[in-house]
Each structure stands twice: as C-alpha cells, then as structure tokens.
C-alpha cells in the first residue's frame, strides 16, 4: 500500500528564478499541483519535510495550503545538478478511488542455483493501481532458479490490486545466468591438468 504523507504548504503568486532562490534560502521549495484541465495550484513547501518525503517511491501526498487540501502524487522532481538539492516539484492531483499508471522499481530476492546470478534487465516496471495502493517496489523471487532462466513481465507476481501495464508482456525483467568469469574459473583446473602431465616427462629427462 502507498505511503501517505501530509505536507503543510502555502499558496504562492510570485514566479521566476529570483523568487525560487529566495524561497530556497528560506528553506522552502516551490511546487506546482496539476489537475487535468483545471488551473494548476502553485504552492511552497517546507524543504526538509518535502526532501525526506520524496525518498518514498510512489507515495500519496495530502497537501494542505491556505484552507485547501489536495491529494496528489509526484509527477517530476527537478534537482540542482551540482548540489543535488531539490529546486522544484511537480505534483499530479488525484481523486480517491482513481487508478493511475506508475513506474515501480524492480528488486530481486532469493538465491539462484549453483553459481548463477540474477541480473535485472529493466529497472522499473509499469503498472496500474489505485492511488491508495501504489507499490513502492516490485520484488521478483529468483530462489532456486537455474542458469538461463528468464522472468518475463507477464510472469511477475504483483501485489493484490496491482495490474501489469506494459506494451510487451514478453519483455524480460530478470535473467538468471552464470557469469562468464565464473564459468572460466570453474573450467580452469581441468584445463591445467594436461599441462601438468606434460611437464612430467620433461622433468624425467633431466
């Protein structure tokens, strides 16, 4: 289930880089809440609380400002490329019971058989879910899977109420295989045996 976070903000009517700089000096972040065909709402949010809140993937926000309350999800986050501080946040207003499409990070758990290793082929999987049930991550189990096994999008077990929403259900999400260096190190002792045998006559000849 999505993490629900409440933020207390203020409406803003001034715009521009100079205004944004002044807000950041005051430990505030400018943000915009978009709402379909309606006029967007322009707000300022507390920097520390907002920065911490944005660590949660696909969180559901309740943003209160000047007597208004809007429920929203993050649409885009702009960061300073050098300082890595948040400069602006775009939100998308949502309604209770609404289903939306989101990109969810993929993680693996479990241990494949033998020397096989799990490789994540796509970092995020697109799914559709109720705004109150947005997953923070998709976990793919690779426990006991053998070399050469692929887990396709259609095979991923999703949380209850979450639907797959990708163009190609046959797309590989995780691949299990033995790395080349592991194969070579396993074969190396066998390859060295004939060389050791060949050295014996040379030693006898001395």
UniProtKB/Swiss-Prot annotation:
Residue numbers spanned by region Disordered: 168-206
CDD domains xrefs: Ribosomal_L25_TL5_CTC (cd00495)
A Pfam family the protein falls into: Ribosomal_TL5_C
UniProt keyword annotations, A-Z: Ribonucleoprotein, Ribosomal protein, RNA-binding, rRNA-binding
Top-rank taxon: Bacteria
Stretches with biased composition (Low complexity): 184-206
UniProt function note: This is one of the proteins that binds to the 5S RNA in the ribosome where it forms part of the central protuberance.
Name by which UniProt lists this protein: Large ribosomal subunit protein bL25
Organism, as annotated: Bifidobacterium longum (strain NCC 2705)
């Amino acid at each position: 289930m999505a993490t629900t976070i409440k933020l207390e903000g203020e409406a803003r009517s001034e715009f521009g880089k100079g205004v944004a700089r002044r807000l950041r000096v005051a430990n505030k972040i400018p943000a915009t809440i978009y709402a379909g065909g309606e006029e967007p709402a322009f707000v300022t949010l507390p920097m520390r609380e907002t920065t911490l809140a944005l660590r949660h993937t696909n969180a559901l926000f309740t943003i209160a400002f000047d007597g208004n309350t809007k429920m929203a999800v993050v649409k885009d986050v702009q960061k300073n490329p050098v300082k890595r501080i948040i400069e602006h946040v775009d939100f998308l207003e949502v309604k209770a019971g609404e289903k939306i499409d989101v990109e969810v990070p993929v993680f693996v758990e479990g241990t494949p058989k033998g020397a096989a290793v799990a490789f994540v082929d796509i970092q995020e999987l697109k799914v559709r879910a109720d705004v109150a049930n947005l997953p923070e991550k998709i976990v793919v189990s690779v426990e006991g899977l053998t070399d050469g096994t692929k887990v396709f999008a259609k095979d991923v077990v999703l949380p209850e109420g979450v639907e797959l929403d990708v163009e190609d259900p046959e797309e590989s999400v995780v691949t299990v295989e033995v790395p080349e260096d592991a194969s070579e190190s396993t074969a190396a002792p066998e390859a060295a045996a004939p060389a050791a045998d060949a050295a014996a006559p040379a030693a006898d000849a001395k």
